[in-house]
Amino acid sequence: MTKVISFILNVLLTIITIVIIIGAYYMYQVKIQKKDYANLFGYSLFEVATGSMSPTIEVGDVVITKLTKEVNENDIIVYMDGKNIITHRLIEKNGNKIITRGDANNSEYKPIEEKMIIG
């Protein structure tokens, strides 16, 4: 029984250590390197701040994005607009110009460039 408890504690300690290391790396990228967002192996985490994607994604939800080179219509994307990080659905793609819209909105937003997409 002691071996089982010891094994479980070791696994938990390992998981906690990994989470702390990842958190420290994220903080390093944002605070020290002054990046707008952190990226680990092509993945980034973002907390949704508005209800523009409701009911698909709610305020306070955390989205995980993966850096990608190809996006298609109806994909949910995260992109940088100035200093704002926005999560919207891709409505139309015309060359390098992309039209997005939040699921809770009827109006289209100004076109963005594909290079603005985070994931």
Model-identified regions with their sequence ranges:
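Short glycine/serine/proline-enriched coil/turn segments at secondary-structure junctions
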Residues: 54-56, 70, 108
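Short linear motifs in intrinsically disordered
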Residues: 64-70, 89-92
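Residue-level detector of beta-strand face positions
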Residues: 47, 76-78, 99
